């Protein structure tokens, strides 16, 4: 999957319209753009009627080729507001190869002041838009936008969704022949179902014939303005073939929209918020006296992207998760709860410098770029041993603030001092027990207690491990406040928050004791010396008594492949029996439904990346539960799936 972002190259004509240099065409007609959208895409698909008929909590999914300036999205959102039930939802999925940068997007959408109620919320969240899947939430989750940034023929095959309405847009076939291909139409068919409708402005004969061959019944209809005719259609072809059963969608839970989430850290609060935004009543059971008391409780966590130049599943998830988290943080108070101060990763040896050079060549400079020592020092505000890789959109977060913000939804009920020891399934309801006390029950449960999920029998075989980490809190001084960005080497140090710098973090694979130790404080101070001797002097580290230093320790929870474990849970024994043939031939795909433990999900194993991966994983869990488009590429969702470990055991004969 390509990693390099290519923004749209825009010129502006004398009427103020954006013009694409790449396609040598305007994005929309000067006086008729909105009316064309309403006629071709909203009218021909009878979208107002569809919205009006939506039941409470039902969701219409619109798919689009070519997001461009977002006009079709804004018009669809406006129509949804006008006609849909207040509890209905809209999920808009759009592919864009060359996204507009923020300045161009702002200039374009302000041509439509009548749509400001819809364009301004997008502009507020239009940050960290990088290649791959980028999800946005609006109006408390009632409207979701998933942008697929990249080539349509690379992105759509990775989409796991059922589309109800297609907006077949993008520049005209003559201007954009690489998009209008049989491969595209085959993907439209794969993602459609009987009843899916389609609107498009083009009436080109070969496009119509190709859509018919793909399974759409197409017809020409009167156009508008200079477009004499346009086309509309409906999918009448067969359903797509099933995927591998171990990654198939579980049946959507019917009945009351009630869920339990066990654990109120980042993974738990994110899962609860994502479900609550979809109309679920969520009870969160937390064993401590408040949320974010374990690994999510550090005063400052770093928004740091440890990427690969090769587009691995982990790298793709980090890019998508980083964008999603950054957009969620816009709702918090900057300076107190988080800060986009940037993150500088020092090139502390030749191997690291080589790695950074490869990353800088693979990614957009807006995401990361190399700095020489003088440039790095100018940004950091302190003397450094060398240059490094700078992430201008990164920064630090106070994780408890993010957890608390997510738990404030009126559909969430947090119950503290409740330690769940056992789960039982009785009459399609999961019951949470503590000894002989029934704590709560619901048809859906999300286990989000880091490595503590292993105490529950359905998760006992998940290969999670705990790694102890300790941070040190250093009182800021007048001169240490010069530090303006997070700086990392083997450890990290953040600019001050409420009068303290956070310094960390140790890695201990053996200790089970959470009491902070003097030895690890000393180890963290040694990490600070590697980052900046100047900053250590500004903090008067030599005068500090390690015995008096404050800090906290917690357990990171990680998996062997460093990807989180997110998704539905299957019965381990029945799974091994159903797919035992894989031990003899890994190419087999038995026609046996996966033995899901209906309504049971997990969100764990985020390691030291929880700020980046846990919030989007909450959306992934909710998409599984509700049968919505997944917010990550299929291959990435499968790489995070709990069943991956059962498959590996079968194939390896263990």
Curated annotation (Swiss-Prot):
Recorded hits in HAMAP family, A to Z, give:
MnmC (MF_01102)
Query: Which residue stretches belong to region tRNA (mnm(5)s(2)U34)-methyltransferase?
Result: 1-236
Subcellular compartments? Cytoplasm
Q: What is its EC number?
A: 2.1.1.61, 1.5.-.-
Q: What is this protein called?
A: tRNA 5-methylaminomethyl-2-thiouridine biosynthesis bifunctional protein MnmC
Similarity comment: family membership: In the N-terminal section; belongs to the methyltransferase superfamily. tRNA (mnm(5)s(2)U34)-methyltransferase family.
Catalytic activity from the UniProt record: 5-aminomethyl-2-thiouridine(34) in tRNA + S-adenosyl-L-methionine = 5-methylaminomethyl-2-thiouridine(34) in tRNA + S-adenosyl-L-homocysteine + H(+)
Q: Which GO terms describe its molecular function?
A: flavin adenine dinucleotide binding; oxidoreductase activity, acting on the CH-NH group of donors; tRNA (5-methylaminomethyl-2-thiouridylate)(34)-methyltransferase activity
Pfam families with a match to the protein in the record? DAO, Methyltransf_30
Gene that produces this protein: mnmC
InterPro entries to which the protein is assigned, alphabetical: FAD-dep_OxRdtase (IPR006076), FAD/NAD-bd_sf (IPR036188), MnmC-like_methylTransf (IPR008471), SAM-dependent_MTases_sf (IPR029063), tRNA_MAMT_biosynth_bifunc_MnmC (IPR023032), tRNA_MNMC2 (IPR047785), tRNA_S-uridine_synth_MnmC_C (IPR017610)
Region annotation (FAD-dependent cmnm(5)s(2)U34 oxidoreductase) maps to: 262-654
Q: Which organism is it from?
A: Pseudomonas putida (strain ATCC 47054 / DSM 6125 / CFBP 8728 / NCIMB 11950 / KT2440)
Q: Which residues cross the membrane?
A: none
Q: Name one GO biological process term.
A: methylation
Q: What does this protein do?
A: Catalyzes the last two steps in the biosynthesis of 5-methylaminomethyl-2-thiouridine (mnm(5)s(2)U) at the wobble position (U34) in tRNA. Catalyzes the FAD-dependent demodification of cmnm(5)s(2)U34 to nm(5)s(2)U34, followed by the transfer of a methyl group from S-adenosyl-L-methionine to nm(5)s(2)U34, to form mnm(5)s(2)U34.
Residue ranges annotated as coiled coil are none
Q: Name one GO cellular component term.
A: cytoplasm
Q: Which UniProt keywords apply?
A: Cytoplasm, FAD, Flavoprotein, Methyltransferase, Multifunctional enzyme, Oxidoreductase, S-adenosyl-L-methionine, Transferase, tRNA processing
Cofactor(s) recorded for this entry are: FAD
């Amino acid at each position: 999957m390509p990693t390099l972002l290519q923004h749209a190259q825009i010129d502006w004509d004398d009427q103020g319209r954006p013009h694409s240099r790449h396609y040598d065409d305007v994005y929309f007609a000067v006086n008729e753009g909105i009316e064309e959208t309403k006629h071709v895409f909203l009218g021909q698909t009878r979208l107002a009627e569809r919205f009006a008929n939506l039941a409470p909590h039902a969701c219409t999914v619109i798919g689009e080729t070519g997001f461009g300036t977002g006009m079709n999205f804004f018009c669809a959102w406006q129509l949804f507001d006008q006609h849909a039930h207040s509890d209905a939802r809209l999920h808009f999925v759009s592919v864009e190869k060359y996204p507009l940068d923020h300045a161009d997007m702002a200039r374009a959408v302000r041509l439509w002041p009548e749509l400001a109620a819809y364009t301004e919320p997008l502009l507020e969240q239009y940050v960290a838009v990088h290649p791959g899947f980028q999800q946005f939430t609006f109006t408390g989750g009632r409207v979701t936008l998933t942008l697929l940034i990249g080539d349509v023929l690379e992105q759509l095959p990775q989409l796991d969704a059922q589309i109800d309405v297609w907006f077949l847009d993008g520049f005209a076939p003559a201007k954009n022949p690489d998009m209008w291909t049989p491969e595209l139409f085959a993907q439209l068919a794969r993602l459609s179902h009987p009843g899916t409708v389609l609107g498009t402005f083009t009436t080109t004969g070969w496009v119509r014939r190709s859509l018919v061959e793909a399974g759409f019944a197409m017809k020409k209809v009167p156009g508008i303005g200079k477009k004499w005719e346009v086309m509309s259609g409906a999918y009448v072809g067969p359903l797509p073939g099933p995927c591998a059963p171990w990654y198939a969608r579980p049946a959507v839970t019917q009945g009351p929209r009630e869920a339990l989430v066990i654990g109120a850290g980042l993974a738990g609060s994110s899962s609860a918020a994502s479900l609550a935004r979809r109309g679920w009543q969520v009870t969160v059971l937390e064993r401590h006296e408040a949320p974010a008391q374990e690994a999510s409780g550090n005063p400052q966590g770093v928004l740091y992207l440890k990427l690969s130049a090769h587009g691995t599943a982990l790298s793709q998830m980090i890019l998508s998760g980083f964008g999603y988290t950054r957009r969620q943080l816009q709702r918090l108070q900057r300076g107190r709860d988080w800060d986009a101060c940037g993150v500088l990763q020092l090139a502390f040896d030749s191997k690291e410098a080589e790695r950074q050079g490869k990353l800088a060549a693979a990614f957009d400079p807006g995401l990361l770029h190399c700095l020489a020592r003088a440039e790095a020092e100018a940004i950091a505000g302190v003397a450094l041993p060398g240059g490094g890789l700078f992430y201008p959109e990164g920064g630090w977060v106070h994780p408890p603030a993010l957890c608390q913000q997510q738990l404030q939804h009126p559909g969430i009920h947090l119950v503290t001092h409740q330690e769940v020891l056992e789960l039982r399934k009785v009459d399609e309801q999961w019951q949470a027990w503590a000894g002989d006390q029934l704590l709560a029950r619901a048809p859906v449960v999300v286990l989000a207690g880091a490595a503590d999920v292993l105490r529950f029998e359905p998760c006992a075989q998940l290969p999670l491990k705990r790694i102890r980490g300790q941070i040190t809190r250093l009182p800021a001084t007048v001169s240490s406040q010069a530090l303006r960005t997070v700086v990392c080497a083997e450890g990290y140090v953040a600019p001050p928050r409420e009068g303290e710098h956070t310094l960390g973090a140790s890695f201990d694979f053996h200790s089970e004791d959470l009491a902070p130790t003097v030895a690890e404080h000393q180890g963290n101070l040694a990490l600070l010396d590697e980052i900046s001797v100047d900053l250590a002097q500004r903090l008067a580290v030599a005068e500090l008594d390690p015995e008096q230093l404050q800090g906290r320790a917690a357990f990171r929870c990680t998996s062997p492949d460093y990807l989180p474990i997110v998704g539905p849970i299957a019965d381990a024994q029945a799974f091994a029996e159903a797919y035992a043939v894989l031990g003899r031939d890994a190419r087999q795909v038995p026609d046996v439904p996966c033995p899901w433990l209906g309504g049971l999900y997990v969100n764990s194993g985020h390691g030291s990346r929880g700020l980046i991966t846990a919030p989007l994983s909450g959306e992934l869990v909710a998409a599984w539960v509700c049968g919505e488009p997944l917010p990550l590429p299929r291959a990435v969702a499968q790489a995070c799936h709990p069943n991956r470990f059962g498959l590996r055991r079968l194939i390896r004969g263990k």
